[in-house]
A protein has these predicted regions:
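Polyanionic/metal-chelating signatures
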Residues: 100, 105-237
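His/Asp/Glu-enriched, well-ordered alpha-helical/loop segment
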Residues: 68-69, 75-81, 85-88, 212, ...
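Histidine-rich, glycine-flanked metal-binding segment
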Residues: 2, 9, 13-53
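Glycine-enriched alpha-helix->loop->beta-strand junction motifs that scaffold or abut catalytic
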Residues: 230-237, 253-260, 288-290
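Divalent metal-coordination and catalytic microenvironments
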Residues: 7, 22, 27, 49, ...
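Metal-associated gating/positioning segment near the N- to mid-region
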Residues: 50-116, 120
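Active-site gating loops and adjacent loop-to-helix segments of metal-dependent hydrolytic enzymes
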Residues: 67-94, 135, 150-158, 207, ...
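C-terminal cap of metal-dependent C-N hydrolases
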Residues: 7-10, 18, 332, 344-380
Length: 380
């Protein structure tokens, strides 16, 4: 057993405990409180004066798929030979030795979603990862988790340059509808061919409500197109990026469609990102839209996830909402809130110890725990 004592603990479950104790047994949090008795056999970590948060969750990255320094060799994020590739699995392209996994831990990020890029209308299946494990195979936590799709500039730019569809937003929407309509027609067939089953299996899961469509979209008009498609096929959808989501907030709230918001700590790289701003987080919160922050690593280095939260507070977001948007909210969006996202008894022991307040840029991550295993030096 491990006992971490003396820290200010942000449980993200409705309270802050000053000078508290966290007891960890194996992979799980056994207890947390202000006045817990520490068992004699426990290995004690003195965290007096420190701050503890649940491990951060980045719900949208390309970690291991798009490496920072290996260019062609480390770029496996977009399969640009076909705009419809739902059969692809991000896990098959990940380099688990990517330096970014250590960067994630340095930033307090203990779990992350890795997904294909946005060149394709249907890009493939996402995988949810731990950033630390005893082996690369054990870093895979949920696979698959969601089917990546895209509307907007990227598919029409990539395939328009190849002189094939989609060259317009109309064609992008049409191809997405066609893929789902074809799959729906095949779903209950008894004599479906093996190749058709393999190619459409992920779409079947979305149609059956077994996993969501993770739809890359920035502009308000593209968001409305996405919502029309959601309504037509009755599927669960989560928006990725959602730069102009605040403009259509009522429509999102009506359908309970959440937004993986970001990357915000970046320039206006494309026309459809002209409204990118940290104030967008506060606007979504005011209008009741569920959202979490994402880095879209390597667009923003994954270790800067909490910097995004801090800058959103500067632009009007409440501190509690900002911290939730990198912990408990992504856990709920990923349907893993029974396991992750808060420091409560029974949850997995994902913790990060900070030298100061987590939203203070000067604070450093001193130690990280993932599933009960430590990464980093002993707290000084």
């Amino acid at each position: 057993m491990i006992a971490i004592q003396g820290a200010t603990i942000y449980t993200m479950a409705g309270g802050v405990i000053h000078g508290g104790v966290i007891l960890v047994e194996g992979q799980f949090i056994q207890a947390v409180g202000a006045e817990l008795a520490v068992p004699e056999e426990a290995a004690v970590v003195d965290a007096k004066g420190k701050f503890i948060l649940p491990g951060l969750i980045d719900a949208h990255t390309h970690i291991g798929l798009e490496e920072e320094i290996y260019r062609i060799e480390g770029d496996d994020v977009n399969e640009t030979s076909d705009p419809i590739t739902p059969q692809l699995q991000a896990v098959d392209g990940i380099n688990f030795m990517d330096l970014a996994f250590a960067d994630a831990l340095r930033g307090g990020v203990t779990r992350t979603m890795c997904m294909p890029g946005s060149a394709n209308i249907l890009g493939g299946q996402a995988v949810f990862l731990k950033t630390l494990a005893a082996s690369p195979a054990e870093m895979v936590y949920r696979n698959p988790w969601g089917l990546k799709a895209a509307l907007g500039e990227n598919p029409k730019r990539v395939y328009g340059a190849q002189k094939k569809a989609p060259k317009t937003r109309m064609a992008s929407a049409s191809l997405l509808r066609e893929a789902f309509a074809n799959a729906r027609g095949l779903m209950d067939k008894e004599d479906i061919k093996t190749a058709e089953l393999y190619r459409n299996a992920a779409i079947f899961k979305v149609l059956r409500g077994e996993m969501p469509l993770l739809l890359h979209v920035h502009r308000a008009d593209d968001i409305l197109t996405a919502l029309r498609i959601k309504d037509e096929f009755g599927i669960e959808m989560q928006l990725q990026h959602g730069t102009e989501a605040a403009l259509v907030a009522d429509e999102l709230v009506k359908r309970d469609v959440p937004v993986a918001l970001g990357p915000l700590f970046t320039n206006r790289a494309k026309v459809e990102m002209k409204e990118v701003a940290f104030r967008n987080a506060a606007l979504l919160a005011e209008r009741g839209v569920r959202f979490c922050f994402i880095t879209d690593h390597p667009v923003i280095p994954i270790e800067h996830l909490r910097v995004c939260a801090a800058l959103a507070v500067r632009e009007g977001l409440e501190e509690e909402a900002a911290l939730a948007a990198v912990t408990s909210t992504p856990a709920r969006m990923l349907k893993l809130d029974q396991e992750l996202g808060t420091i409560t008894a029974g949850k997995r022991a994902d913790l990060a110890i900070y030298s100061g307040h987590p939203l203070d840029f000067r604070s450093r991550v001193e130690r990280v725990m993932v599933d009960g295993y430590w990464w980093g030096k002993t707290v000084e």
